[in-house]
Design a protein with these regions (language model features):
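Non-catalytic recognition/regulatory regions in large multidomain proteins
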Residues: 2-3, 38-41, 56
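Short amphipathic alpha-helical interface segments
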Residues: 2-30, 83
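Short amphipathic alpha-helical interaction segments
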Residues: 33-48
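A short, conserved structural fragment
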Residues: 47-58
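Minor-groove-contacting beta-hairpin "wing" of winged helix-turn-helix DNA-binding domains
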Residues: 58-67
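Short, amphipathic alpha-helical interaction segments positioned at domain boundaries
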Residues: 66-83
């Protein structure tokens, strides 16, 4: 597998949030693809830039009222299907 850029990692996290809203599930599914540190860093960045919001202690949602999901690059489609 090729090395993913930080932008690719954040896009992957956003699309994974569409599939798994619970933070615990999100970390579990992404841990096969990304290091936990990268998942946490990407999630913190997405929350800080208001592209993702936390709903209660466990639920994470894309903040589509604030910003649209970026287009999914071809190189991430297969990775996303596998998580």
């Amino acid at each position: 597998m090729t090395e993913l850029s930080m932008n690719d990692k954040m896009i992957l996290i956003q699309y994974a949030i569409e599939k798994y809203e619970k933070e615990e599930d999100l970390f579990q599914k992404l841990s096969n693809t990304l290091p936990e540190k990268d998942i946490q860093r990407g999630l913190d960045t997405l929350i800080g830039t208001q592209r993702v919001r936390r709903i209660g202690p466990e639920i994470i949602q894309n903040n589509t009222s604030h910003t649209e999901l970026p287009e999914l690059p071809e190189n991430l489609k297969q990775i996303l299907e596998n998580i």
